Design a protein with these regions (language model features):
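Conserved N-terminal phosphate-binding loop of PLP-dependent enzymes in the Aspartate aminotransferase
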Residues: 1-406
Length: 406
């Protein structure tokens, strides 16, 4: 095969992975920016994993040092793992009796559900419309989005979906000030569409798909609702945890007491690691659900420890500062005739436009101007790396205002 055919073949193989707006090749990167061979800069505004930014020398050194040590120890003490466990314990105020490391968020979700089933002796799991919990069989079955399930065969049994409090699209047309009518609807669904045998309810403290933020007090009411029915309360912070909201975990801002807490993505800064934290201590017979796996890989643990170190050394305060800049800009943007609403939770935001064609046009124009937000239908979404600067956010907002005025 000659070089031209080889390049064409590679393009065909990668076609499903290419964005709708093809980007030029990048030759280097730094912080939240990518650069082309001719010096053009593109600011990444949609990166949930590599939160410490590109070219982070301290992170690279921490991982390199770990690679030079024992990388896959068996039945021995691993300093990076022990340190990470202590950091997770510290970050959650010592509220959890057991911590298990996994190699992905999907694995963490499935492990948590299996553990909840074992602890309660029940089988069903309650999830939410529009939720995202992973790509594996059970975790995708638990995700409330048709794109994750339609056409892929039979789903895992025992999953019951409840309405998430998306006030903009309230199915009862009672947005705001309704006393959480969607929770009343959840009660009816549970009574009529399930065997009333739920081991747990699993919820994202804000939904990663669309950055839908529940009204204040809803999550606490949901927790009380679940516990009154004998269910465990699982908080999935795989997207929201490890600093995205300006706090290490959003459940702390809401005053929640989850039975099981999940975290991942930002935890490893691109390395494959996630965690399940259990409030209840685990007996020996519970440990089989966690047997095997590679979540406690020494290199991934070292990576996560470095994420904690940088968050504690000023990066978390930086996230809070940039989040305020973003929130102020989004509040002003809501006056634009093309904008239906803006939603945000720390450094996660969604700009909901009135129609999809406008959103597609604006997204394309922003890409050409060197900004890389995400897009889904009529929503632009922002989940930048934590090192994004106030200046980069302000430049993006200025470009967005200009494109919305044309």
């Amino acid at each position: 095969m000659n070089d031209e055919n080889r390049r064409a073949g590679a393009a065909d193989l990668l076609a499903p992975l290419h964005p709708s707006d093809p980007l030029p090749p990048f030759v280097r990167a730094s912080g939240a920016s990518y650069f082309t061979a001719d010096g053009r800069e593109f600011v990444d505004l949609n990166e949930m994993r590599v939160v410490l930014g590109q070219g982070n020398e301290a992170f690279t050194q921490a991982v390199t040092d770990a690679l030079h040590a024992i990388t896959a120890p068996k039945n021995v003490h691993v300093p990076s793992k022990e340190h990470l466990i202590s950091l997770l314990d510290w970050a959650t105020d010592g509220a959890f009796a057991a911590i298990h490391l996994t190699s992905s968020g999907s694995e963490a979700v499935e492990s948590a559900v299996r553990l909840a089933q074992k602890l309660t002796g029940r089988s069903e799991i309650l999830s939410f419309w529009n939720s995202i919990h992973g790509r594996t069989y059970l975790s995708s079955s638990m995700s409330g989005k048709s794109q994750r399930k339609a056409g892929y065969g039979a789903l895992a049994p025992g999953v019951v979906f409840l309405p998430y409090p998306d006030c903009l699209s309230c199915p009862m047309k009672r947005a705001g000030g309704c006393g959480f009518a969607c929770l009343e609807m959840a009660s009816r669904i549970y009574e009529t569409a399930s065997a009333q045998d739920a081991c747990a309810v699993i919820v994202e403290p804000y939904q990663g798909s669309g950055v839908i933020v529940p009204p204040e007090g809803y999550l606490k009411k949901l927790q009380d609702w679940a516990k009154a029915r004998g269910m465990l309360f699982i908080v999935d912070e795989i997207q929201s945890g490890m600093g995205r909201t300006g706090r290490l975990f959003r459940y702390q801002q809401e005053g929640l007491e989850p039975d099981l807490l999940l975290t991942g993505k930002a935890l490893g800064n691109g390395m494959h690691i996630a965690a399940v934290l259990s409030r209840k201590p685990l007996a020996k017979e519970h440990l089989h659900v966690f047997a095997g796996g590679s979540g406690d890989d020494a290199v991934a643990c070292a990576a996560a420890c470095e994420v904690f170190r940088q968050l504690d050394s000023g990066l978390l305060a930086h996230v809070q500062s940039v989040s305020r800049t973003l929130q102020e800009g989004l509040t002003a943007l809501e006056a634009n005739e093309h904008v239906l609403t803006c939603r945000s939770c720390g450094l996660a935001a969604a700009i909901v436009l009135r129609n999809a064609p406008t959103c597609e046009r604006v997204h394309h124009a922003l890409t050409q101007r060197g900004f890389l937000p995400g897009r889904q239908e009529n929503v632009l979404f922002l989940k930048p790396p934590y090192v994004v600067t106030n200046e980069q956010i302000l430049a993006f907002l200025a470009a967005l205002r200009q494109e919305l005025s044309t």
